Amino acid sequence: AADPAGLYGTVAKLTIRNASPGRCELRPFQISPEGPAASGVFGEQWCWFSHYFPRDWVIDHPRGADGDASYLVPHARELVLQFHESPDVGDAAHYPSLQMYVYGERMCMALTYDTTATSPNTSAGRVPNLQVLSSWPLVRGRWIDWVVRLKVSYAADGILEVYRDGRLEFAETGVPTFYNDILGGYFRGGLYRYGDAQMPASRTIYHRGFVLGDANSSYEEVAGKPALSRAAIRSIV
């Protein structure tokens, strides 16, 4: 489709209609994890992506236990990025360890992990160590560029950094970021819809794709330009 902002020529137009759950997914080339070491490190990954929410995007005000983390993620309206997993044989299905999603007028980021070998049945609503880490205003009518740096680990040595339009707006180190599984995870993104019959009949966003990197990569390599200086970092509203 033509870029609605008139900046980038042809871009991907992602639409989902009258379904919950619904999916319009971009599957970036999967970087193989470095393999689980004794400490549980699965390797470091970088992910750049850019999306555009149209000006006529209808804000869907959530109904339910607003602010309750256990409610937020399962009832998120639209997911735009996830770091997915491959559960061990005999293990229960997991929520993605990292999710970015629309919730009302906010773009939220949540993390879940499990250091134990057997995770609970998350389909029953038991999400281990779920944290809604941060949120930003949902911007419509403008391209937003994101970069996520993730060191995948179920030990206390993981890394999570999130850049928004070149600014480092969230950083946490020395924390678990994944499940205690044999296989590592992978990025998926696009538009995923969860909710109820009261939601809008269709949803559309525009997307410029993904650039992925491994432990040898950097912000500049995946984003194509340097990050802004730390002095330019804004506080998150």
PLM regions: where:
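Low-complexity, Ser/Thr/Pro/Gly-rich disordered linker/stalk regions
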Residues: 1-236
